[in-house]
């Protein structure tokens, strides 16, 4: 009996020791449960600042010639809430780890990225989960309610204001944002981006007087006095490098079925916009005829409203322009942008036209165009010769482009 009791106790002791050892052994050092926020931020930045090609169909820039594309024809399609369990989840983890380590410098970026993603979600879907979203792990809230679009927009504006305040404090303290692959740890530049993006959101709401407790026009006027992007050096952009995993997204892409859209080509040719030479290649027919790259008649696009087979016939006949091959042959390509100085200048020009702020709308408008030309001049390699400052001046003097104070408000905005 004593022997049995001793054996039982020995087995229990061994079991307890085994459980303890089992737990220790199964702590995977290659799958940590806690990390520094500086290791999360690069992925958060890359996800937000990268750009795909889907919108090029809806924006009538390209057509597909080897199959049917729903976006090209504005067909109903299934949307995805994957932003919640991908990008927004990583933003939430950034906040959690920053709180754990006591690094308040990430607070402003947390609110900015949340605002950015919820802004895009509500534009796409309307009413979406917002106030109760992303609280499954922290609060056990796995069925968040849907908030109205107005509530989401008000929340976005609130969070952007918080982001600006937090980044202003970080900048004044000269705090460094470790892991920042956009602005090299410069909180002041992040604040400029945030404030510029606030103006973009407010202009999106131009047909509203108030959203929540936000007076659209008054708030725009106030933010316009805060630090904003002052040149292309402040662009919110992701610069690529020739390194595995960090190359331009379209490098070595297979584009055999993608060609230029007639809508896009015709608009640029009408305005004699030399940026067309950077986007597209002359048709094979035009090239065989010896037409120059700078000849706007050398370019043609496919009709985005017809069955893809009709555009495929144009490909065979050499009567449709390809996307410029520079996009898939350069490993660093050009930066992808969340928002840039050129866009901000157009926003300010429209605000002046609407009477929201004082200023010279013509100057803002021309600043934006020149900034766009300068940006492409920096990143377009051999094509930079087509987008010089002189080329921008010539473009701005064109009948379809030059500023005309005699136009109506709606015509100027268009």
Residues of each region from the PLM?
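Conserved, well-structured interaction surfaces
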Residues: 64-175, 331-336
